[in-house]
């Protein structure tokens, strides 16, 4: 048993890791470590680690370390995000359908405009045109981390807007992968996953059989952990990106405590998994995903229309699609922007949405299997666009953060 000082130390560490700012710095540190390592003389060690495979072959889970992190470990982060969104839909900003509609429409516009921009750059090149899906995706982990680091005083609805937008964006990108970039989709595992998700949702209700289960001597994790593992494995086997399993289970969590409960399962798991998500999952993910090698120099990258289309799509297309699409939507429909936000806030957030790593790099691999030069340049383009979007978004949001800090100090000078 841990001693009292040890327990106190672990509690303090957990509290520290629950901070989005601390998690953001850890993730950025992981990304910088990966970039330096991959482009150093020891880059072959980094690549060997990422490509090392393990897992049961019979279950089609003999995966590389990189895949285990991107598909498996990151599902924990997506569960935490889905769970947080569920709380917002039930108790928070997204209870208002007119406000919930706006980030959803923004996500759709933020996928369409970058794809069109990329297609315009590469319309005359059949070898590079298949990469139109690359600039569609927002890397939610990096975007939320940067927002946390630069925007401690920004209104909370901005983070909710970004979370909702990024989840819809990821879902859209995964549908694009399934329809346009996947040779075959296995529907039987997908149906099985859907049925088990229904069981998961039923158990969350805490009535009937679920109530008897909750009152049994067995701890809940004995049931939920294997169930979650099987759901994840089935989604993975279907060909759909397995992190969707995490989002789905997070959205099914019960956010209202039953009679006799001190807190709901949603709040309990948010408290438990938050430190693991920010302190372990995101930094490890950054180390495994951000190691892009700059081969051939920057000039060769910027001479390639695939890289230029990606950079323009992620930096310009995302901003125009999200901010412009949101503004037009508020003028033409009943959708409305939160009173706590201004359009410059949405513009800064839209710039951050131009950060593309995981899904963008995945689509890059699927787009150019027979064109290694385009593949290398496109990956470098994703990285350059993400760095540019980070800097521009951080500058805009840092200015807005200072503005909101002054407003709060004026209201409560102490």
UniProtKB/Swiss-Prot annotation:
Stored HAMAP family: NhaA (MF_01844)
Biological role stated in the UniProt entry: Na(+)/H(+) antiporter that extrudes sodium in exchange for external protons.
InterPro entries xref list: Na/H_antiporter_dom_sf (IPR023171), NhaA (IPR004670)
PANTHER family: NA(+)_H(+) ANTIPORTER NHAA, SODIUM ION/PROTON ANTIPORTER NHAA-RELATED
Domain of life per record: Bacteria
Keywords: Antiport, Cell membrane, Ion transport, Membrane, Sodium, Sodium transport, Transmembrane, Transmembrane helix, Transport
Protein's name according to its UniProt entry: Na(+)/H(+) antiporter NhaA
GO terms assigned for molecular function: sodium:proton antiporter activity
UniProt record, GO biological process: regulation of pH
Primary location: membrane
């Amino acid at each position: 048993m841990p001693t009292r000082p040890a327990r106190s130390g672990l509690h303090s560490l957990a509290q520290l890791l629950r901070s989005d700012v601390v998690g953001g710095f850890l993730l950025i540190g992981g990304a910088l470590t990966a970039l330096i390592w991959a482009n150093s003389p020891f880059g072959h060690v980094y690549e060997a680690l990422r490509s090392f495979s393990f897992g049961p072959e019979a279950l089609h889970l003999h995966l590389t370390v990189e895949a285990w992190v991107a598909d498996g470990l990151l599902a924990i982060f997506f569960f935490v995000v889905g769970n947080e969104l569920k709380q917002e839909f039930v108790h928070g900003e997204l209870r208002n359908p007119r406000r919930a509609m706006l980030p959803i429409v923004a996500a759709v516009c933020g996928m369409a405009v970058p794809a069109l921009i990329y297609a315009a750059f590469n319309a005359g090149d059949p070898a590079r045109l298949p990469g139109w899906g690359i600039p569609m995706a927002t890397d939610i982990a990096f975007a939320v981390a940067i927002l946390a680091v630069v925007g401690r005083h920004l209104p909370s609805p901005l983070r909710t807007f970004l979370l909702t937008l990024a989840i819809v964006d990821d879902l859209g990108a995964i549908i694009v992968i399934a329809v346009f970039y996947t040779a075959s989709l296995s529907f039987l595992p997908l149906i099985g996953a859907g049925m088990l998700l229904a069981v998961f949702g039923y158990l969350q209700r805490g009535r009937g059989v679920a109530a008897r289960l909750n009152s049994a001597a067995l701890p809940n994790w004995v049931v939920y952990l294997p169930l979650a593992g099987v759901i994840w494995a089935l989604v993975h086997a279907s060909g759909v990106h397995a992190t969707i399993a995490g989002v789905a289970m997070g959205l099914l969590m019960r956010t209202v405590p039953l009679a006799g409960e001190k807190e709901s399962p949603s709040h309990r798991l948010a408290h438990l998994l938050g430190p693991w998500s920010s302190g372990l999952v995101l930094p490890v993910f950054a180390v495994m995903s951000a190691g892009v090698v700059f081969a051939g120099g920057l000039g060769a990258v910027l001479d390639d229309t695939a890289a230029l289309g990606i950079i323009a799509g992620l930096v310009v297309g995302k901003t125009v699609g999200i901010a412009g699409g949101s503004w037009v939507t508020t003028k033409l429909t009943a959708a409305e922007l939160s009173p706590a936000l201004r359009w410059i806030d949405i513009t800064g957030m839209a710039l951050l949405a131009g950060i593309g790593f995981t899904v963008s790099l995945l689509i890059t691999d699927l787009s150019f299997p027979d064109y290694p030069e385009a593949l290398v340049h496109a990956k470098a383009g994703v990285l350059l666009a993400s760095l540019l979007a980070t800097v521009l978004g951080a500058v805009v949001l840092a200015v807005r953060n200072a503005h909101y800090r002054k407003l709060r100090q004026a209201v409560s000078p102490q």
